[in-house]
Curated annotation (Swiss-Prot):
Induction: Up-regulated in cells overexpressing CDKN2B. Residues 2-133 form the CID domain. Its main location: nucleus. Belongs to the UPF0400 (RTT103) family. This is Regulation of nuclear pre-mRNA domain-containing protein 1A. Changing Q21H: In a breast cancer sample; somatic mutation. PROSITE patterns: CID. Residues 244-286 form a coiled coil. It comes from Homo sapiens (Human).
């Protein structure tokens, strides 16, 4: 990966698009350079405020991706984003429309669900986003309809995916978390003591308690890491599903167009074949001049009219 500099980050942020691939690519670059987390967050906040309103939400998507996916590597980004994230939410919320606030609300819901930040930060984010109004609780049916609408809007880009992009997406899933046999074995081998609260009664001394605490901590880290990888894989598979749907739609449109062209050229072929057949028929009925006597340069004279009509 390229070396980190504030100028390089500014350039990458200026080129950031709303596509999942663009966000994830820059997110990976930032996580790779996580030792520069403080200047990264500073540049991110500065460029966020300079960005056009229709690009501000993408900056929050980037922060979300970095914060969630860097947790496995270390707490740097979660900690360094904390002092600025509330004001960032407030800024984006005030500069954009209700649709954007709806997307911000989804990000906030995920952070609540996954306990990305402490409750006091989450409450400040809610205040920044909703003000004194509490977010309205939605029914299960409303949530499903909302998800379907969101999936449809993301699944109908103006341009279908390139074949190479589709192949790469499929190849990436060959090494997906669900196929990691080694981790499966480690999870399957977790001792029952770390999974059953009822067995805590068997702890009789501090040493055994600390030993079990270490085992539980390791199990939590293993499962949290694997759950994060599975969540990322689910997102990748959803994206691949959309890509395949777009690719299939494009291929169906191309198929219909080519079938129409084929019928058109079949009709042209039929017309040309008919002309050829008729031409051959007419050629057969014409006299063959090559079979006439060659009179050029011969001493043979054509008869005179008087010779033809002379009386005997």
């Amino acid at each position: 990966m390229s070396a980190f500099s504030e100028a390089a980050l500014e350039k990458k942020l200026s080129e950031l698009s709303n596509s999942q691939q663009s966000v994830q690519t820059l997110s990976l670059w930032l996580i790779h350079h996580r030792k520069h987390s403080r200047p990264i967050v500073t540049v991110w906040e500065r460029e966020l405020r300079k960005a056009k309103p229709n690009r501000k939400l993408t900056f929050l998507y980037l922060a979300n991706d970095v914060i969630q996916n860097s947790k496995r590597k270390g707490p740097e980004f979660t900690k360094d984003f904390a002092p600025v994230i509330v004001e960032a939410f407030k800024h984006v919320s005030s500069e954009t429309d209700e649709s954007c606030k709806k997307h911000l609300g989804r990000v906030l819901s995920i952070w609540e669900e996954r306990s990305v930040y402490e409750n006091d930060v989450l409450e400040q984010l809610k205040q920044a986003l909703y003000g004194d109004k509490k977010p309205r609780k939605r029914t299960y049916e409303q949530i499903k309809v909302d998800e379907n609408e969101n999936c449809s809007s993301l699944g109908s880009p103006s341009e279908p995916p390139q074949t190479l992009d589709l192949v790469r997406a499929l190849q990436d899933l060959e090494n997906a978390a669900s196929g990691d046999a080694a981790v499966h074995q480690r999870i399957a081998s977790l001792p029952v003591e770390v999974q059953e609260v009822s067995l805590l009664d068997k702890i009789t001394d501090k040493e055994s308690g600390e030993r079990l605490s270490k085992m539980v901590e390791d199990a939590c880290m293993l499962l949290a890491d694997y759950n994060g990888r599975l969540a990322a894989e689910i997102d990748d598979r959803k994206q691949l599903t959309r890509m395949l749907a777009d690719f299939l739609r494009c291929q169906k449109e191309a198929l219909a167009e080519k079938e129409h062209k084929l019928e058109e050229y079949k009709r042209k072929l039929a017309r040309v074949s008919l002309v050829r057949k008729e031409l051959r028929s007419r050629i057969q009925s014409l006299p063959d001049l090559s079979r006439l006597p060659n009179v050029t340069g011969s001493h043979m004279h054509l008869p005179f009219a008087g010779d033809i009509y002379s009386e005997d």
